[in-house]
Amino acid sequence: MANSLCFFSSPPTFCFQSPSKNPKPSHFFSTNDNTSSLVQKRELLQTSRSQSFEVKAANNNPQGTKPNSLVCANCEGEGCVACSQCKGGGVNLIDHFNGQFKAGALCWLCRGKKEVLCGDCNGAGFIGGFLSTFDE
């Protein structure tokens, strides 16, 4: 079966077929050629397929989750977020608490794990999770 790509614009309209059959563009509807018959044009119309694309999703919600979703918008259902002190690096960036936790040592908050529990869902990954006090 030959694949074809057709352009419908002001006359003449061209149809490009796959290289296996005919690599040259052929007239789909000829403007000044009276030798082609209506049967040939109808056959070409019936064998060619057109595809249309339809947008099914749009980026209306900047947080990335549905507005009525149970999934936590802060952690996106993971239950943990990047550590706010080390920015996900696992080590202290500066000295903390009068030098008790030195820069370059394991992070004092996440202890080198690079992630901490989400504060919005308490690590559950969904709104109304474990020990949550948020009610609507």
Swiss-Prot record:
GO terms for MF: protein folding chaperone; zinc ion binding
Cellular compartments annotated: Plastid, Chloroplast stroma
Mapped zinc finger ranges (CR-type): 62-133
Tagged with keyword Signal: no
Annotated residues for binding of Zn(2+) 2: C83, C86, C107, C110
Any single Pfam family the record assigns to this protein: BSD2_CRD
GO biological process, one term: chaperone-mediated protein folding
Organelle targeting peptide span: 1-56
Source superkingdom: Eukaryota
Record-level GO cellular component terms: chloroplast; chloroplast stroma; cytosol; protein folding chaperone complex
Residues at which Zn(2+) 3 binds: E78, C80, E115
Chief localisation class: plastid
Function as written in the Swiss-Prot or TrEMBL entry: Chloroplast chaperone required for RuBisCo biogenesis and translational regulation of the RuBisCo large subunit (RbcL). Stabilizes an end-state assembly intermediate of eight RbcL subunits until the small subunits (RBCSs) become available to produce a complete stable RuBisCo complex containing eight small and eight large subunits.
Subunit structure: Interacts with the RuBisCo large subunit (RbcL) assembled as an intermediate complex made of eight RbcL and eight BSD2 subunits.
Protein's recorded name: Protein BUNDLE SHEATH DEFECTIVE 2, chloroplastic
Organism from which the protein derives: Arabidopsis thaliana (Mouse-ear cress)
Gene designation: BSD2
